[in-house]
């Protein structure tokens, strides 16, 4: 029989760093989703109002200058917890809080330092405001805005979020992407399956024009075999385009930006998941 090499300390550190790299990529991607930052700031406001424990939100902070032998951020990436599972965790936390008494008591010993948290959340809030104002003034594509977004991601990456908080932010972004996909599937089904527009023609017209109606108006008037059918489906297609426009308004992101954030988030999740699988397999050999 062959022998299986056991995981060395160096190998364990390498896997841990790859897990952390994947999670950092997810967290940096999520930082570009405005709702993620506002949600986290709202959670901290609840802590200050004594509605939450600080340890319900974060486990601590990462010093960007001290990354050696750093343990991976706690997260359920790889276990695919859904909203129902996260809700169950919330209920368990509430029960624990009732048993423990005052929600502010657990932050004194071993939990996050409240003073450091106040400073870090203040920094996050300030940078979020700088980024928001730059987007309003210059647009997301502007050089100054891109620099502000990068700085916001750097600040956000320093937060060690509790698993349920991290995963809720990821799930929120995933659900937003699913809303986009639902409307895109509706539009494609109407155009390709029912109106018989060639899929290649549809993809060329629709891609990067998801919230525009010009491509649709052109195809209706193009005198093609599918044009009369598109006219008949005008109301349904316009409704779906309107819902995509609503998503852009809600998020402050274009559909293309939502897709790009989701793509980078998915790549980071895959990296972390692969490294976690390696860690589990290595531990099973022991």
Where are these regions (language model features)?
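Transcription initiation cofactors for RNA polymerase, centered on bacterial
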Residues: 1-286
